[in-house]
Amino acid sequence: MKRVIFSLYIEIPDEELDLQPPYPGEEIPKTIRTKQLFQDNYEFLKNRQISYAEKCDTDYILYEYDQEYIDYKNYFNKKYPFVTTYNIVNFYKIKKLYDLSEIYDEI
């Protein structure tokens, strides 16, 4: 049985973020703060996921902001210009899940 654990790290450009009000007592919008925290903890999070996949004896795939994602995003922007980048990332995640289901038994 083929198994995989996958994750996405798609860094949305600042100008495409759907800005949310700051957390109480802060001045930075929530979306910027979240983006900063993901950037700051990228290696830690990735290494934890790799470690978990190794313990589960599964493959591990991390999808990032690469040409495949850019092509997918451009397609979405042309066909559905009203869809936010955040939602495109979520649709991309579903697409990758479907793609992996063609290869793996468990995802």
Can you name each region flagged by the protein language model?
Residues 107:
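Short glycine-aspartate micro-motif
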Residues 1-92, 99-103:
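N-terminal anchoring/stem segment of glycosyltransferases
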